[in-house]
Amino acid sequence: MIKGVVNKIFGTKNDREIKRYQKRVAKINALEPKYEKLTDEELKKAFNELRQKVKSGQMSMDEALEDSFAITREASKRVLGMRHYDVQLIGGMVLHEGKIAEMKTGEGKTLVATLAVALNAMTDEGVHVVTVNDYLAKRDATEMGKLYEFLGYSTGCITSEIQDDQERKKQYQCDITYGTNNEFGFDYLRDNMKYSLDEIVQRGHNFAIVDEVDSILIDEARTPLIISGPTNRKLDNYVKADQIAKQLEKDKHFTVDEKDRVILLTQEGIAKAEELFGVENLYSLENAILAHHLDQALKANYLFQKDVDYVVRDGEVIIVDEFTGRLSEGRRFSEGLHQALEAKEGVPIQEESQTLADITFQNYFRLYKKLAGMTGTAQTEATEFSEIYGLEVISIPTNRPVIRKDLDDLIFKTEKEKFDAVVKKIKELHQKGQPVLVGTTSIEKNELLHKLLKKEKIPHAVLNAKHHEKEAEIIAQAGRKGAVTVATNMAGRGVDIKIDDEVRELGGLFILGTERHESRRIDNQLRGRAGRQGDPGASQFFLSLEDNLLRIFGGDRIKNIMNRLGIEEGEHIESKMVTRAVEKAQKRVENMHFESRKHILEYDDVANEQRKTIYKFRQELLNPEYDIASKIRENRAEVVEELLSQSEIFPETPKDDFNLEKLSKVIQEELGTKIGVEEMKDKEYDELKNFLIERLEKEYEEKMGQLEEEQRREIERILYLQVLDNAWREHLYQMDILKTGIGLRGYNQKDPLVEYKKESFNLFMELVNRIKKEAIKTLHLIELRNEQEEEEIRRLEEELAKMEAQIAQEAVMQHGEEVKTEPVITKKKPARNEPCPCGSGKKYKHCCGKSGPKKGILAAANG
């Protein structure tokens, strides 16, 4: 209440920010006459002079903002025939400051982005504009590219159609690059699998503007991007697990928690599964794979629905994106879930894959020095944007007031009654000539409504993942008189639905929602399709107690209200109280998802630090100037120490107790070098260690000395990279296993997150030691051919080319299964003067707190 009074007197923080921006808008408007007078050539020259000042550091971007915005607006008037409104100038400033601009549908977000893009591209470090699909990326790059070209910029566009790396690289070299979140993310992962700097396509992460930022940074945050390849761990138990899952009875053998999407076997279920598998203990170590298969088979059969979560087409299971309703072709669920769905549907089961590289959108977008976003709906998730990405949400006023009427929800007892009422309402609107856009939450419901409308002979267009090719065209026509469009929640974001004067007279576009989504934001997006730029319009949701949201999260309370009111079949209730109860249920789901995403990030942050360390070292290895010789010397000394301890020889061991026979054998087995016991006799620990290091180095130098310096360095780098990549892939597999089983630690009164951090750190240290040891072993065992010094390099390069081609051919880009994790535990960041958690022994402020790991691990690479 006090907050409300304060806001009335002083205005909200958002109001104060808007006032601050309005002062600068006045200054930009004051510059308009000055730039209007200039010829095209003079205008281009003025912008180029401004750009050079920013590029050379004579002027900051913020100092150049007013002139840059004024010139960009003038150029837009001339090239595109569009003048930026004052509210669009505010939007541009919000984006430039690295915030999220919440702008209603039809307020011209695409044009707003040009202001911040043109200003931020002045540093020549590249600007990425991220959209939700290839169609929008191509459309915006083509349309806005004309404006950028006038200003002297080059514009590129990355789509899934561009397969050639050099062509992709060319697009990234442009001043401004448009593309989808998937393409940017996968290019980053692929770049970190390359064996030459020339093949890397991206050129850093300077500034990104994310269009439909809520969809990309929130809806898709729970599904990681994964590049996977075939694994030799081929398993053929999917069909068996599917047969068993189908024989188990719900509630008797297992319980289903739809709220958390979890299935748990009962004691009776475990006994039945053990009997059917023919094993004594389903949860013993040797049967862990069977238990995992059964878990995935149960999920596939009882949590995943055909035509809702996936479709079957041409003998393939294709994922339906739950947020956009589009088919995610080429993507596969991970951890054997996709194979379980294939077994369920009786289609050919494709080989299980192994993760080669993965990252979440949360961690990919946090790579950018500056990040900004635009959307029509962000305030409901303002807390999440702030906590996870450090992004503030600013609501931009509309250019014209919104006059759309948002009517109260109508609630029916059954789904059948609801759809009968929906068809009746559509018929009524169609006869009147008022266009209606009907929103459904799944393909299944979409097609059900399609059949009902067909039966009533109501002409209509259908838009879902199965008919998405003409998406933009269908949506653009949805505002015509008498048009009826039935769409899943993909609903053509980014495409305006325009109406004419006749339709305005009829009341504008009518939005009819057939079910509430789990997120209020997606409902608001649907409402926002109507009433753009001050147009009339209306929106209303028709619900039933059988809808998923009400059934799982809040049906009982509403059911009681309906029973008390004595609602008969076919009747509905329409009340503010019920609408509030529905919103309460949505808030509960949103909070649950927020906690889940936050928790996933805590887990992924552990893997992310490891990923950054490995990728940083990989980048160093790719640099031809990298001092690989020092790295090999350093690793050799560490490997010698390990071989000594392997032979039970330690600094405190008396020299007479040294097991030199074992040491001699270990050195020959591991490094292929024969050193006799006599040569090592009568030496103290340090003397013996130094003798071995020198002897191994001498032999290695004699062998590699045959090569020219450049050839030698190339062989060493390539071999080191191969060892690193193989070890990293194996590590990712181990991490997957760890993540799958870590939740069980909670039953042992242990915090799963703390345990995960501990175990993953141990795995990472093992990885680091394995890389060092394997690299030294490989380099010492390599045999050079005498005929021609270049032969070895040629052989390695051919092998490498084959390997890369194989990875490219076999790798599958996919979204992982939505990750489910344990309850949230807050992670405390170390204080500046505390010891660094990486184990370097330094204070946090002098180590990782400064600029990433410095010591030990792989960071000693420059030694």
UniProtKB/Swiss-Prot annotation:
It is a peripheral membrane protein. Its cofactor is Zn(2+). ATP binds at residues 88, 106-110, 496. May bind 1 zinc ion per subunit. Its main location: membrane. It is found in: Cell inner membrane; Cytoplasm. InterPro entries: Helicase_ATP-bd, Helicase_C-like, P-loop_NTPase, SEC_C_motif, SecA, SecA_DEAD, SecA_motor_DEAD, SecA_preprotein_X-link_dom. GO terms for cellular component: cell envelope Sec protein transport complex; cytosol; plasma membrane. Zn(2+) binds at residues 836, 838, 847-848. Pfam families: P-loop_SecA, SEC-C, SecA_DEAD, SecA_PP_bind, SecA_SW. GO terms for biological process: intracellular protein transmembrane transport; protein import; protein targeting; protein transport by the Sec complex. Belongs to the SecA family. Part of the Sec protein translocase complex. Interacts with the SecYEG preprotein conducting channel. Has a central role in coupling the hydrolysis of ATP to the transfer of proteins into and across the cell membrane, serving as an ATP-driven molecular motor driving the stepwise translocation of polypeptide chains across the membrane. This is Protein translocase subunit SecA. It comes from Nitratiruptor sp. (strain SB155-2). The gene is secA.
